[in-house]
Amino acid sequence: MQLVQLANFVLDNLVQSRIGFIVLFHCWQSDESLKFAQQFMKPIHPILVYHQFVQMRGVLNWSHLELSYMGHTQPTLAIYVDIKCDQTQDLLEEASREQIYNQHYHWLLVGNQSKLEFYDLFGLFNISIDADVSYVKEQIQDNNDSVAYAVHDVYNNGKIIGGQLNVTGSHEMSCDPFVCRRTRHLSSLQKRSKYGNREQLTDVVLRVATVVTQRPLTLSDDELIRFLSQENDTHIDSLARFGFHLTLILRDLLHCKMKFIFSDSWSKSDVVGGSVGAVVDQTADLTATPSLATEGRLKYLSAIIETGFFRSVCIFRTPHNAGLRGDVFLQPFSPLVWYLFGGVLSLIGVLLWITFYMECKRMQKRWRLDYLPSLLSTFLISFGAACIQSSSLIPRSAGGRLIYFALFLISFIMYNYYTSVVVSSLLSSPVKSKIKTMRQLAESSLTVGLEPLPFTKSYLNYSRLPEIHLFIKRKIESQTQNPELWLPAEQGVLRVRDNPGYVYVFETSSGYAYVERYFTAQEICDLNEVLFRPEQLFYTHLHRNSTYKELFRLRFLRILETGVYRKQRSYWVHMKLHCVAQNFVITVGMEYVAPLLLMLICADILVVVILLVELAWKRFFTRHLTFHP
């Protein structure tokens, strides 16, 4: 055996693979092992390789192979196996049972078997598509100092789902005691990446877990597939159909077949049952329907790419009595401004009375007023000017007219600013409810209905948020006997439209379509929206140890880069309601006018009371004069 040349080949292979740790399973004699190790200690490449020798002779049981011989913390560990040894068959079978022909181990299987003999040996082994296995056939050349090593790439698209062993020649190396050279390529593998050469899964049938919530599972598989394949009524099971169409694109890219496993929920608990449970227990290879990446699920699954967005909201129209506000006409100015404005008007009223008094006493008779107005009359003139009212009394003096000019100028400025603020506030947007959080909603008196979705029920059962517990206690437990607590999306949206104050909880990707169908543009702007649960992303999941992880990730990234994903998402998923309030006239409702009418009624009552007091006082005063002449 040409051990020096073999050591040089192994070292060169490790350098090309960027690996610094190797375990060598062999059946050499002690002096041969020493010779091989000495060549490793004085390598032709300036690198340090950690190596460990395992003598296969005398090993009777290869159980717990990975734990006993391959414990490491490196990204990849190289493993050399001498196929000519008698114990090789048992070792390779145990590696197949433990499923360690994967990307974490760089296998070098060295022997002189023909490709057909190697195929018969490895054909029954569980080798994965991400396997890094090389079969190396050595052949001593004529000069006896150089050895040719033909390297073959070995992988399987999936033994348990119909895949066949693939052995493809890669290249040939020629090694002498000093150096190794690549002499020729045996195929075109070097032109593409590892997964570029393995992207065609033509011989396997992938098992895909799919959720269907809007059709009974008693239907045949063909009927369910036909439903998921339809492109109309995008609001019905939109998330499941969105994921299904992405999976069909993946199928076309991989040129494979798929067997769909249908379920009516994502999971019964976090990782048990449903489509998620099928991937966890490895009865499915992939989830077509995106799901949440929770902490519990990530112990068993890997999220390979974002393929969705989850948003549940509570919508309701503002109740008619919720917008009644007594201070709507006082809002343009703060209390301090109102006090100062009233003080200025009072001061001007006093100045006007002084002006009229001086004019009556000091001016010439022809310029005098017929009578001296009272202080109350001048106050009335001042406050009337603030309301853009004229006056029948006009000062004759220049000073008095300057006071009038200042009064009307101040009133004009204040009035225009006041009316602009009031009108803009009344005509800008309708009254919105003050309910902005789930806690406020739970503490309100509003009636609640929910869309009967599996993940909504699961969230109510497993959420640890205190506001959700309060919501369940106040809104759910009190309606356990109410058959209308759980309503389909269409009925729930219609009830929101017809009953202001009714709250409906639904998933936006499907529910928004009904809102856009049954609500006018103005009614959409009137809606209040409260986030039912934190917004979360949906991911396509594989099992944590899936051998298809990297291949599927690359294919999904390709779908994302080409814009196909964005096109599908915009078609299937509705994430936002569009309010175009500037395109229509908003009517001012009673919620704004009622405070004004209330103030007018109160003023009328006050006037009547004052009138009655004045009449009573006059009557009393008249009687008093009659009895005391």
UniProtKB/Swiss-Prot annotation:
Q: Which gene encodes it?
A: Ir75a
Which molecular-function annotations from GO does this UniProt entry contain? ligand-gated monoatomic ion channel activity; olfactory receptor activity
* Protein topology in the membrane: Multi-pass membrane protein
**Superkingdom, according to UniProt?**
Eukaryota
Question: Membrane-crossing residues?
Answer: 336-356, 375-395, 403-423, 593-613
> What SUPFAM superfamilies does its record include?
Periplasmic binding protein-like II
Q: Which residues are glycosylated?
A: N61, N112, N126, N144, N166, N232
Q: Which PANTHER family match?
A: IONOTROPIC RECEPTOR 20A-RELATED, IONOTROPIC RECEPTOR 31A, ISOFORM C-RELATED
- Its name, as the record gives it, is Ionotropic receptor 75a
Keywords per UniProt:
Cell membrane, Cell projection, Glycoprotein, Membrane, Olfaction, Receptor, Sensory transduction, Transmembrane, Transmembrane helix
The UniProt disruption phenotype note reads: Severely reduced response to acetic and propionic acid.
Question: Where in the cell is the protein located?
Answer: Cell membrane; Cell projection, Dendrite
Function statement = Odorant receptor for acetic and propionic acid. Functions as part of an olfactory receptor complex including the ionotropic receptor coreceptor Ir8a.
Q: In which tissues is it expressed?
A: Expressed in acetic-acid-sensing neurons in the antennal coeloconic 2 (ac2) and antennal coeloconic 3 (ac3) sensilla class of sensory hairs (at protein level).
Which organism's genome codes for this protein?
A: Drosophila melanogaster
Coiled-coil stretches are: none
Record topology, Extracellular segments: 1-335, 396-402, 614-629
Annotated GO biological process: detection of chemical stimulus involved in sensory perception; detection of chemical stimulus involved in sensory perception of smell; sensory perception of sound
Q: Name one GO cellular component term.
A: cell body
Regarding protein family, the annotation reads: Belongs to the glutamate-gated ion channel (TC 1.A.10.1) family.
**Topology feature Cytoplasmic, residues:** 357-374, 424-592
Q: What is its main location?
A: membrane
Please name the Pfam families in this protein's record.
IR75A_N, Lig_chan
